[in-house]
């Protein structure tokens, strides 16, 4: 997270690599993106050591547990040597590139999705705008929280759900963030209770794990208010059970893509409980249209190809 903030703050492009990638996949991502600096933990350092043909790549180690290979430097040593200095002035414009996130394509290697600062900020502000509109329409405004809200980061930061919806959205919401190294439902429940966290986002398998633990009654989980989802549809029965099994947590979900910077449509609370098979309404900053094979718009309820337009849409596929 600090590396991401640092890179985007100086006008560099942050390339988030899949943590599960092996040596050949890492080599592809590094070569395709043209990355100049790799910031990696020991597991990733071991993998990249097997990569060849990465000329000019500077490697910075985070929490290394082994002697560093030739040319690899410890990030902690570098930052401590610099000390506390002011940030240099940097000219960053809204349409300058900010991130490359790799997404699996229909064929071949994953494609790098290039997004600008404007694209990402538009997505983050869209969630906030959708919430304000919902409060205006329903007349229901949540009371001010007794303690600072907090979210459990239980999904990867190389995915827009983790990076945008969990991490970056927390800045405007002034949420605390508690991160897990990998998913463990018992540890997740312990962290939620210990830190009195109010929200978590995860795919159906993850929220299903937490639901079963809540039903077992081993943990309190009374602080949890929102149990968000995405990435794959939930079974309607899981939606209903979330509404019944937590003290105050309500389910939420949505549809989005890496290419839309996570936004698309969304639904939550009682609306979702009433319509558990729905993905919700369109984000207000997007135009959605369903067309047939000839490009003709289809009426509501018909299946077809989905077109999306809006300011959060990416700049293009890198090197494509």
Predicted segment positions?
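A short helix-loop-beta submotif of the ANL/AMP-binding
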Residues: 1-15, 19-23, 31-37, 149-150, ...
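Structural core segment of the AMP-binding/adenylate-forming
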Residues: 9-78
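Conserved helix-loop-beta element of the AMP-binding
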Residues: 34-37, 53-67, 86, 145, ...
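Conserved pre-ATP/AMP-binding loop-to-beta segment of ANL
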Residues: 83-102, 109, 143-150
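Conserved AMP-binding A3 loop
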Residues: 98-126
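Conserved AMP-binding/adenylation subdomain of ANL enzymes
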Residues: 121-150, 154, 158-198, 213
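Gly/Ser/Thr-rich phosphate-binding loop
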Residues: 172-173, 197-201, 211-274, 287
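Conserved beta-loop-beta connector loops within the AMP-binding
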Residues: 275, 289-307
């Amino acid at each position: 997270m600090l590396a991401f903030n640092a890179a985007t703050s100086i006008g560099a492009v942050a390339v988030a690599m899949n943590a599960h990638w092996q040596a050949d996949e890492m080599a592809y991502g590094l070569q395709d993106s043209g990355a100049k600096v790799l910031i990696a933990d020991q597991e990733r350092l071991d993998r990249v050591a097997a990569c060849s043909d990465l000329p000019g790549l500077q490697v910075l180690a985070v929490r290394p547990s082994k002697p560093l290979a030739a040319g690899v430097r410890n990030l902690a040593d570098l930052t401590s040597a610099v000390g506390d200095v002011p940030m240099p002035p940097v000219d960053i414009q809204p349409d300058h590139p900010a991130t490359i996130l790799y997404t699996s394509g229909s064929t071949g290697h994953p494609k790098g999705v290039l997004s600008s600062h404007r694209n990402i900020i538009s997505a983050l502000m869209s969630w906030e705008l959708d919430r304000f509109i919902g409060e205006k329409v329903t007349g229901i405004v949540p009371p001010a929280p007794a303690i600072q809200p907090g979210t459990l980061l239980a999904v990867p930061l190389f995915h827009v759900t983790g990076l945008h919806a969990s991490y970056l959205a927390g800045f405007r919401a002034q949420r605390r963030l508690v991160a897990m190294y990998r998913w463990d439902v018992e540890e997740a429940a312990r962290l939620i209770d210990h830190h009195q966290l109010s929200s978590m986002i995860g795919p159906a398998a993850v929220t299903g794990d937490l639901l079963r633990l809540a039903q077992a009654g081993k943990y309190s989980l009374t602080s949890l208010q929102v149990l968000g989802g995405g990435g794959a549809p939930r079974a309607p029965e899981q939606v209903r059970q979330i509404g019944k099994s937590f003290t105050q947590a309500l389910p939420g979900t949505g549809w989005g893509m890496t290419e839309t910077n996570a936004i698309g449509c969304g639904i939550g609370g009682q609306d979702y409980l009433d319509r558990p098979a729905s993905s919700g309404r369109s984000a207000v900053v997007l135009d959605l249209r369903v067309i047939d094979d000839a490009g003709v718009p289809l009426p509501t309820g018909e299946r077809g190809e989905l077109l999306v337009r809006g300011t959060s849409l990416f700049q293009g596929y890198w090197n494509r």
